Each structure stands twice: as structure tokens, then as C-alpha cells.
Curated annotation (Swiss-Prot):
Record GO biological process: protein catabolic process; proteolysis
Pfam families reported in the protein's UniProt record: ClpS
UniProt cross-references to PANTHER family, sorted A to Z: ATP-DEPENDENT CLP PROTEASE ADAPTER PROTEIN CLPS, ATP-DEPENDENT CLP PROTEASE ADAPTER PROTEIN CLPS1, CHLOROPLASTIC
Domain of life: Bacteria
Function: Involved in the modulation of the specificity of the ClpAP-mediated ATP-dependent protein degradation.
Gene encoding the protein: clpS
Name of the protein: ATP-dependent Clp protease adapter protein ClpS
Length: 102
């Protein structure tokens, strides 16, 4: 309500506690056709790994069938999955990137 040019303000304080966002693992899955050097390139390009890190993860994918490339909030994880899958298709590779709740 206004009183002689003064404005009365009501400020409500929320009694809710902020929760951290749910985190998701971004996973690369092995296949029999995608070249190893392409997987290393993907890891460097989309997950900012150096060559040594990318090679280690690529070998884990090759030997264990899949590997976690990073853990991110849902929106970032979803974007990385879409970017990797699109990049793989553009380069005619069946490489599959997926996500699961951490």
C-alpha cells in the first residue's frame, strides 16, 4: 500500500532449501566399426581430455564395452550426448553415446 509517496514492500522469505542438481554419467559404448582414433578425437573435442586421458578411456571402452566420459547436470549431459551422436553420424560412425543417472 502507498502512504504519502512511500511504498510499503512485502518481502516473503522462502523456507525451501536449494538442492544440488541431479547428476548424470555420459557414457560411450563400444562397437566393432568406429576407429579408435575417432573415439580419442571425440573425447578430446567434447570432453576436453588430453591425448593420454582420451587414449586411456578409449581403451577402457574397447576392453570393457563402455566407459564414463564425465558426470554432469542433466542439461549438460543431454547436450553432450546429442553432440557426440550427431558428430559420429556426420562422420559415418555408429559410435553411441548415452547417459544414466549417477
Amino acid at each position: 500500500m502507498a502512504k504519502a509517496g512511500n511504498i510499503e514492500r512485502v518481502v516473503e522469505r522462502a523456507d525451501t532449501e536449494l538442492m544440488p542438481p541431479s547428476m548424470y554419467k555420459v557414457i560411450l559404448n563400444n562397437d566393432d566399426y568406429t576407429p579408435m582414433d575417432f573415439v580419442v578425437e571425440v573425447l578430446q573435442l567434447f570432453f576436453k581430455m588430453n591425448e593420454h586421458q582420451a587414449t586411456e578411456i578409449m581403451l577402457q571402452i574397447h576392453h570393457q564395452g563402455k566407459a564414463v566420459c564425465g558426470v554432469f547436470p542433466f542439461g549438460i549431459a543431454e547436450t553432450k550426448v546429442a553432440q557426440v551422436n550427431q558428430f559420429a553420424r556426420q562422420n559415418q560412425h555408429p559410435l553411441l553415446c548415452s547417459l544414466e543417472k549417477a
